[in-house]
């Protein structure tokens, strides 16, 4: 009998942090929530909480150690933490001036460095799971900034872009860990040397869009994200690493259409805060 799967949810804020985990719990997952506002320990609903501040990348090893000891080895890791300040759209590089560069360091840590360290620890955790374990997926809650430059999101966008590069890199570099391939009519399976089907490591930069391919900003839908993340967690093969999706239709490939037009846009929907 296989062990109960474990969702490690890093960055459990008041929106997605309350909407995504119940979807996994209903699917039979043990749930671990991590945020700086939480206190360590099991909760009445069975969830396990861990306190951590992701502006400090060295917090990640301790989080993984606690989860392994108290709950079990994570089978799915979601990185959802976000922290940044909007830059001055008239002078965005002023955020890197000596008096304000700390906000750049924080944005890069929370949205870039810390999640990439989480990728490394997730890889180590996934490797210790039985080969046939479903999941072994790391999902990063991304946005359009790895494609498009918004005038007041220099620091945030640099961090998101760095993480997107790392996740894409991981999806290629660790593809070999899906073992040798055996092709059958109409199906592609990944098998070990004993002929048993294997589930490989998977990495995703998940990005909800409108039906026209534009960013949803604050309107990101937690239920839709939970459904898509669960779908990614339960597939046995790597889907597109840049997993753009819409609330009603799931995955959609928007390509590069018109993204850079937002660089000079002063339209409110391009300057408002949010993810």
What does each model-identified segment do?
Residues 78, 118-122, 166:
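Hydrophobic positions on the long internal alpha-helix
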Residues 186-275:
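C-terminal helical subdomain
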Residues 78-92:
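Conserved NAD(P)H cofactor-binding loop of Rossmann-fold oxidoreductase domains
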Residues 12-23:
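N-terminal Rossmann NAD(P)H-binding glycine-rich loop of SDR-like oxidoreductase domains
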Residues 55-73:
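Conserved Rossmann-fold cofactor-binding substructure of NAD(P)-dependent oxidoreductases
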Residues 83, 95-117, 127-176, 186-193, ...:
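Catalytic loop of short-chain dehydrogenase/reductase
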Residues 27-42:
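Conserved glycine-rich Rossmann-like NAD(P)H-binding loop of the short-chain dehydrogenase/reductase
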Residues 44-59:
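Rossmann-fold cofactor-recognition segment
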């Amino acid at each position: 009998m296989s062990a109960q799967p474990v969702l490690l949810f890093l960055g459990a804020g008041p929106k997605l942090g309350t909407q995504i985990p119940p979807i996994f719990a209903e699917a039979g997952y043990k749930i671990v929530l991590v945020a700086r506002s939480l206190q360590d320990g099991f909760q009445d609903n069975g969830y396990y909480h861990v306190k951590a501040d992701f502006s400090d990348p060295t917090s990640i090893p301790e989080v993984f150690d606690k989860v392994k000891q108290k709950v079990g080895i994570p089978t799915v890791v979601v990185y959802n933490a976000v922290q940044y300040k909007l830059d001055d759209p008239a002078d965005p590089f002023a955020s890197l001036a000596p008096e304000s560069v700390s906000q750049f360091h924080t944005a890069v840590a929370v949205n870039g460095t810390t999640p990439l360290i989480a990728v490394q620890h997730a890889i180590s955790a996934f490797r210790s799971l039985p080969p046939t374990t479903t999941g072994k997926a790391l999902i990063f809650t991304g946005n359009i900034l790895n494609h498009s430059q918004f005038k007041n999101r220099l620091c945030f966008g640099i961090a998101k872009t760095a993480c997107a590069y790392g996740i894409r890199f991981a999806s290629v570099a660790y593809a070999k860990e899906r073992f040798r391939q055996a092709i059958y009519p109409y199906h592609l399976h990944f098998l070990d040397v004993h002929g048993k089907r294997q589930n490989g490591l998977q990495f995703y930069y998940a990005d909800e869009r409108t039906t026209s391919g534009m960013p949803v900003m604050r309107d990101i839908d937690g239920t839709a994200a939970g459904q898509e993340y669960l779908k990614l967690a339960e597939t046995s093969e790597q889907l597109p690493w840049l997993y753009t999706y819409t609330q009603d239709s799931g995955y959609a490939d928007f390509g590069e259409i018109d993204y850079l037009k937002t660089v000079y846009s002063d339209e409110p929907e391009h300057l408002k805060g949010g993810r």
